[in-house]
Amino acid sequence: MLKQRTLKTVIRASGVGLHGGVKVNMTLRPAAPDTGIVFRRVDLPEPVDIPAKAFMVGDTRMCSCLEKDGVKVGTIEHLMSALAGLGIDNVWVDLDAPEVPILDGSAAPFVFLIQSAGIEEQNAAKKFIRVTKTIEVRDGDKWARFEPYDGYRLAFSIVFNHPAIDKSAQKAEIDFAEQSYVREVARARTFGFMQEVEYLRENGLALGGGLENAIVLDEFRVLNQDGLRYGDEFVKHKILDAIGDLYLLGHPLLAAYSSHKGGHALNNQLARALLEQQSSWEIATFEQAEHAPSGVTRWLAQAAA
């Protein structure tokens, strides 16, 4: 049986929120089977639990933000991406501020923390969302699409008309069966442009951003002294974000995802469109591991290594 997964032990980390710039302490705790990923704001008079679900997403400006009764948890996508990439089904995420810490701007620190704590299999079948019909959403020349696929594959293309980005690959594809999330996706950092910083900060965004937690570009070049971690780091980060955004479906996907010029808003629209069209997907479990797609078993074995 392909089993659900949680953490072996508690994980603690602290940092600043990318957009709010406020220090935040985060604790990840093991959770029982079928709990899912649940964020808990512990800084309030009464703790508020917000499940990581697509229909709980409110603001999608520059990040994915969950909201319940006016209580928010923002910039969840990098942590969600790490949890998805490592096949973690159930975890409590305690926060004492309204944002997940940005750490280095990628998913790699979260991957390191989770792997350090250890991954524990649980005595319950892992549930997948298997896409059975093509679903597409569009916004002008931007689009995102799900298609049936016996595994999990993501393809993304970007257009920024910037010299540094134009020099990098602007298309990338990741198949969980063939490529390592940890090695080839998790280290890709978020990126931003100096000319946008003033506008963002006037609107209460990017207050905690800097060279230590993002790729920063001026009009011509990357300002980070160490340069890029991947030749295609910009588009790889878009894939990293998409993996996190789409994990708000509540289960890992069996599907091919593709997008052109997409982002958090379009990813959330696609997830909601899929959930609303119930004839386009089904829940799949595998009581016998050998009956699962070979790529899925390879991915899960690799993620637990």
From Swiss-Prot:
GO terms for cellular component: membrane. InterPro entries: Ribosomal_Su5_D2-typ_SF, UDP-acyl_GlcNac_deAcase, UDP-acyl_GlcNac_deAcase_C, UDP-acyl_N-AcGlcN_deAcase_N. Its EC number is 3.5.1.108. One of its GO terms (biological process) is lipid A biosynthetic process. It is an enzyme of class 3 (hydrolase). GO terms for molecular function: metal ion binding; UDP-3-O-acyl-N-acetylglucosamine deacetylase activity. It comes from the Bacteria. It catalyses: a UDP-3-O-[(3R)-3-hydroxyacyl]-N-acetyl-alpha-D-glucosamine + H2O = a UDP-3-O-[(3R)-3-hydroxyacyl]-alpha-D-glucosamine + acetate. Disulfide bonds: none annotated. The keyword Lipid biosynthesis applies. The keyword Zinc applies. Its cofactor is Zn(2+). It holds the Pfam family LpxC. Keywords: Hydrolase, Lipid A biosynthesis, Lipid biosynthesis, Lipid metabolism, Metal-binding, Zinc. Pathway: Glycolipid biosynthesis; lipid IV(A) biosynthesis; lipid IV(A) from (3R)-3-hydroxytetradecanoyl-[acyl-carrier-protein] and UDP-N-acetyl-alpha-D-glucosamine: step 2/6. The active site is at 264 (proton donor). Zn(2+) binds at residues 78, 237, 241. Belongs to the LpxC family. Catalyzes the hydrolysis of UDP-3-O-myristoyl-N-acetylglucosamine to form UDP-3-O-myristoylglucosamine and acetate, the committed step in lipid A biosynthesis. This is UDP-3-O-acyl-N-acetylglucosamine deacetylase. It comes from Dechloromonas aromatica (strain RCB).
